[in-house]
From Swiss-Prot:
Tissue-level expression: Highly expressed in heart, skeletal muscle, spleen, testis, uterus, prostate and thymus. In testis, expressed in germ cells and Leydig cells, but not in peritubular myocytes, nor in Sertoli cells. Expressed in prostate cancers, in seminomas and in Leydig cell tumors.
Principal cellular location given in the protein's record: nucleus
UniProt xrefs under PANTHER family: METHYLOSOME PROTEIN 50, METHYLOSOME PROTEIN WDR77
Self-association and partners: Component of the methylosome complex composed of PRMT5, WDR77 and CLNS1A. Found in a complex composed of PRMT5, WDR77 and RIOK1. RIOK1 and CLNS1A bound directly to PRMT5 at the same binding site, in a mutually exclusive manner, which allows the recruitment of distinct methylation substrates, such as nucleolin/NCL and Sm proteins, respectively. Found in a complex with the component of the methylosome, PRMT5, CLNS1A, WDR77, PRMT1 and ERH. Directly interacts with PRMT5, as well as with several Sm proteins, including SNRPB and SNRPD2 and, more weakly, SNRPD3 and SNRPE.
Disulphide bond pairs: none
Protein name in UniProt: Methylosome protein WDR77
Organism whose genome encodes this protein: Homo sapiens (Human)
Keyword list, A-Z: Cytoplasm, Nucleus, Phosphoprotein, Repeat, WD repeat
GO cellular component, one term: Cul4B-RING E3 ubiquitin ligase complex
Length: 342
């Protein structure tokens, strides 16, 4: 296991404070979500979880190192309520799960200085906690504290299907990157469901969660179409094969609830695991720890791997920090005299 190595300090190009039109003057404190785009631009979702109004906002940074400084963003917009989750739809679309109960689709204009609302649909009756775009790119899935899961047609701006297969609030949905009709969901009813919308009975239960410990996070393996990972409220991360519906591996990674799991784009992918214990852990294919950071001072809420530098992992949290981690990609040296350095 290797501790965090600070990224090399490269003198940044001279930046000019230039708040774009319609961008809020101030970003909310709690950073909930982060996603890199394929060109390396960084999208942030922020929420204010104190006071009488739960506000939120979206921010695009062409220079991720400038985040979360509002004056150096490329585009920004105020949202009606807090941002619980977000994801890219193509290169310019932004799908948002809102604390208001809405699923929102925003779009960058051609100059990428404005974020414009395409639709805002109140189909859920409580906070929308999670969204995921199906691999086709034309449909999406949302999960809510109202117990419902909904499948959306993004172009038609309508709900195609609504499901109440869970018995408690939905904590995470994850679309398969391999099959455009398949996704996972987990809930506070202590169940993980595997969905295939082509089937008359689309949901089947994966019986792998530990009794008494609620699953909180899901992520599909990017290369193995039948394999996924999940994290639970106890801090454990487990690897599951859907063919056998059993846990292949399990590891106690954190001391508190797992808040997110994100695979890297490596040929043999790493897994970033985030937690309410304020730490980030990076795991290898056997769920052994390669790297750990405790740079955050509050819950770590999201992570995203840079598409341009596969060693760079960016995390955000409720402490308003955007932390860029350099993760070692080479095998660790074996212990012994040969590994001693001056």
């Amino acid at each position: 296991m290797r501790k965090e190595t600070p990224p090399p300090l490269v003198p940044p190009a001279a930046r000019e404070w230039n708040l774009p039109p319609n961008a809020p003057a101030c970003m909310e404190r709690q950073l909930e979500a982060a996603r890199y785009r394929s060109d390396g631009a960084l999208l942030l979702g922020a929420s204010s979880l104190s006071g009488r109004c739960w506000a939120g906002s979206l921010w695009l940074f062409k220079d991720p190192c400038a985040a979360p400084n509002e004056g150096f963003c490329s585009a920004g917009v105020q949202t009606e309520a807090g941002v619980a989750d977000l994801t890219w739809v193509g290169e310019r679309g932004i799908l948002v799960a809102s604390d208001s109960g809405a699923v929102e689709l925003w779009e960058l204009d051609e100059n990428e200085t404005l974020i414009v609302s395409k639709f805002c649909k109140y189909e859920h009756d409580d906070i929308v906690s999670t969204v995921s775009v199906l691999s086709s790119g034309t449909q999406a899935v949302s999960g809510s504290k109202d117990i419902c899961i909904k499948v959306w047609d993004l172009a038609q701006q309508v709900v195609l299907s609504s499901y109440r297969a869970h018995a408690a609030q939905v904590t995470c949905v994850a679309a398969s990157p391999h099959k455009d009709s398949v996704f996972l969901s987990c809930s506070e009813d202590n169940r993980i469901l595997l969905w295939d919308t082509r089937c008359p009975k689309p949901a089947s239960q994966i019986g792998c969660s530990a009794p008494g410990y609620l699953p909180t996070s899901l992520a599909w393996h990017p290369q193995q179409s039948e394999v996924f990972v999940f994290g639970d409220e106890n801090g454990t991360v487990s690897l599951v094969d859907t063919k056998s519906t059993s846990c292949v591996l399990s590891s106690a990674v954190h001391s508190q609830c797992v808040t997110g799991l994100v695979f890297s784009p490596h040929s043999v992918p790493f897994l970033a695991s985030l937690s309410e214990d304020c730490s980030l852990a990076v795991l290898d294919s056997s769920l052994s720890e390669l790297f750990r950071s405790q740079a955050h001072r509050d819950f770590v809420r999201d992570a995203t791997w840079s598409p341009l530098n596969h060693s760079l992992l960016t995390t955000v949290g409720w402490d308003h920090q955007v932390v860029h981690h350099v993760v070692p990609t080479e095998p660790l040296p074996a212990p012994g005299p040969a590994s001693v350095t001056e």
